[in-house]
Amino acid sequence: MEDEVAALVIDNGSGMCKAGFAGDDAPRAVFPSIVGRPRHQGVMVGMGQKDSYVGDEAQSKRGILTLKYPIEHGIVTNWDDMEKIWHHTFYNELRVAPEEHPVLLTEAPLNPKANREKMTQIMFETFNAPAFYVAIQAVLSLYASGRTTGIVLDSGDGVTHTVPIYEGFALPHAILRLDLAGRDLTDYLIKCLGERGYPFTTTAEREIVRDIKEKLCYVALDFEQEMQTAAQSSSLEKSYELPDGQVITIGNERFRAPEALFQPAFLGLEAAGIHETTYNSIFKCDLDIRRDLYGNVVLSGGTTMFSGIADRMQKELLALSPASMRVKIVAPLERKYSVWIGGSILASLSTFQNLWCSKQEYDESGPGIVHRKCF
């Protein structure tokens, strides 16, 4: 492989797709992982109507489209739509010919084997990639933080995972998945605001609430105390201007929505919170490596962007861990994109160049080659 050809790095999340070139410090393209199809054929006269729209274009035309997310809870469930997203990524966003660049894709922890094979097949057969690699998202986040051992709490839009990693290898028996992430918090905030008399119903309005969540929500260090403060004074209230000019006031919802990460019962879920899930994940690991994991808890993904989340994690994990344990929460500023950044770092390492799975190897061995080359 020639040095001058940059590898493409694509991180496909449930909510957003991040894509760009290896060696860059940030993704060039970040767009919603959605595919939209017209609700009614032939309504838009003379629009030169397409049968499908992807990403921002689908988002902006959502009034006349049915929107679908091909990635649910981090796992690809609709391959035809996924292919459309990849096509859009190569040709419209990055404007590259995929047959000229090695491609690094990311996958969810515990991704079914058949899924990796399908990914591999599409990259080689549909897009004719010269070389391909698939890496686990959380492992890339850990690399981006400059570590090879630690536990990653990766929480995005569709799913949250705790992934213990030792010397660069994820420990599958100790990986835990929590089906509670950004989208659920947005829905819960919609419910909280609805109770206050601010109804948000359409998919378009849901995007407004997502923005409110991202701009105004935070994690309280002491939830009960914060609820009391909010009840006694208006010091925690903030106002938000809706697109139509109406101004709404948001109070305890600011910290009630993200609190669901620590108390899933708020959403009616019988699951452990992110602090307890992290603890359980560490507990499933060998005694000898637990100290290294407690000392390197790395946050990753957009849902870990709430202010106050690291301090709260520190407090909760300290309460659960053995008495003499040193707990350190690492919250890199760029954690929203750390999976992509880790991929960019990995794919540009000189030592990585002989790890790619080549088209020739694929032609000789078939899709199963991915299990031997990528782990």
From Swiss-Prot:
CDD domains, alphabetized: ASKHA_NBD_actin (cd10224)
Location within or outside the cell: Cytoplasm, Cytoskeleton
Statement: the UniProt record of this protein carries the keyword Glycosyltransferase: no
Catalytic activity: ATP + H2O = ADP + phosphate + H(+)
EC top class, as a word: hydrolase
UniProt KW keywords: ATP-binding, Cytoplasm, Cytoskeleton, Hydrolase, Nucleotide-binding
EC identifiers of the protein: 3.6.4.-
Gene Ontology cellular-component terms listed: cytoplasm; cytoskeleton
Keyword ATP-binding part of the UniProt annotation: yes
Pfam families: Actin
Record Gene3D superfamilies: 3.30.420.40, Actin, Chain A, domain 4
GO function terms (MF aspect): ATP binding; hydrolase activity
Family designation: Belongs to the actin family.
Alphabetical list of PANTHER family matching this protein: ACTIN (PTHR11937)
Biological role stated in the UniProt entry: Actins are highly conserved proteins that are involved in various types of cell motility and are ubiquitously expressed in all eukaryotic cells.
Protein name as it appears in the record: Actin
Gene that this polypeptide is encoded by: ACT1
